């Protein structure tokens, strides 16, 4: 069975609706961390974008889920639908192949 990890970085305000949507889409577990970061816009708001603007790290949520490879497109579509506003700060999605998973309690791989 091929697995992938989908990692999402988005604003704190979007987390609750994203969590509900992922649960409804069949995601059975997730890891969530509060992080600080910014993208190429250096943490600016849309009306502030400036080449010389000093980088500002903004509070974000980082959500990681592991799903079967055949579920990736469906889950990514759910994420994009929940996060999209068309404005700076909607978020980022990263997708990684998982080589192996070991359940510590049982040793199952």
Language-model-derived ranges and their functions:
Residues 1-109:
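Positively charged, small/polar-rich N-terminal and surface patches that mediate targeting and assembly
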């Amino acid at each position: 069975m091929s697995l992938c990890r989908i990692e999402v970085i988005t604003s704190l305000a979007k987390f609750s609706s994203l969590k509900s949507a992922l649960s409804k889409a069949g995601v059975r577990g997730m890891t969530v961390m509060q992080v600080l970061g910014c993208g190429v816009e250096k943490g600016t708001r849309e009306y502030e974008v400036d080449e010389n603007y000093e980088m500002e790290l903004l509070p974000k949520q980082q959500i990681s889920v592991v799903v079967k490879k055949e579920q990736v497109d469906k889950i990514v579509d759910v994420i994009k639908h929940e996060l999209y506003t068309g404005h700076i700060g909607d978020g980022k999605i990263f997708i990684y192949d998982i080589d192996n998973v070991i359940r510590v309690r049982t040793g199952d791989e």
